[in-house]
Amino acid sequence: MSRSSRMLTTVALLIQLGGLVFALMEPKSKPLMFLALFIYMTGLLLMNGTLTSEFVRKTQLEADQIAAKQIQQTLHPQKVEELSGYELEMFYKPLRGVGGDYFDVIALPNGRTLFALADVSGKGMPAALLAANIQALVRSMSNVASDLLSVAHHINNHLCCYTPPERFATAVFALLCHETGELTYVNAGQNPPILCSSGRTTFLESTGIPLGLVRETQFQCRTVIIPPGGKLLFFTDGLTDGIGGLEPEGRVCEAIGNDSATAMSSITSLLNPKFNEDDITILLLKRLSGFI
């Protein structure tokens, strides 16, 4: 039982005691009448103070959560610089006011863009704080972001050194060359991004374990080509968990294959509210057919 609950129980007993004394006293017993009224009024005052304190605490907590939500929203890209020859759609829905999903899109020199997506273990405020930490680490390394292995290595070692063992993150970092459609990526235990083109589906499988588990972990880079008309989907497991049922990835692949203008809405329409138990992040990148 919490401290506030114990206080309310004690106060309720005081009020009941005052009422009992009042009910049992002799009709003309003024001392007992005053005692009963004193106990009763004391109980009411204590209850009022306890409820007021609880209300203030709850109001402050709600205000803190709103402020944290607003801060986290500023950490996620609200507007992305135009990607020449590409279209990008983003969808983010935290389970609670704040969440442990992190995503970023960072423009780099020479027609390149860095995509980062991470899913922190846990939910709520603790996960959101670690997600903000990862965001700061990625942004601080934007000058060397073309070296994805260094990015993954640095963040992994940082988490191993400064976070508890139960706190870790799956992540994917991907570097896109706009002109060629070449995408180099490191996947640290994240749900495999899905590349769809000409009716074929390719999963960008994991190239290393999640970040923050083992210090000095070795990761690998792999490269794929996004051809004109191709679509690449980054997502956290909140998407597949939120779809539920058998083979949710297969249903996602079918939705990606829809017309480019409706692909994102087709994906999000698969979500079932009764399975919504996690943060959901989706990035859908499309290479336009007219740019080669």
Show the residue positions of the predicted features.
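Catalytic core of PPM/PP2C metal-dependent serine/threonine phosphatase domains
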Residues: 68-71, 125-205, 219, 275, ...
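Short gly/ser/thr-rich secondary-structure transition/capping motifs
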Residues: 97, 166, 212-217, 265
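Primarily the active-site beta-strand->alpha-helix module of PP2C/PPM metal-dependent phosphatases
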Residues: 30-40, 96-172, 245-250
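DG-centered beta-turn motif at the end of beta-strands
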Residues: 119, 190, 235-238, 279
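Amphipathic alpha-helical regulatory segments at dimerization interfaces
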Residues: 54-57, 70-81, 91, 137-141, ...
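Active-site-proximal, acidic helix/loop segment immediately C-terminal to a metal-coordinating Asp/Glu
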Residues: 126-144, 226, 230-276, 288-292
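Regulatory cytosolic signal-relay segments
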Residues: 32-101, 153, 192
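Alpha-helical transmembrane segments and their helix-membrane boundary motifs
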Residues: 1-53
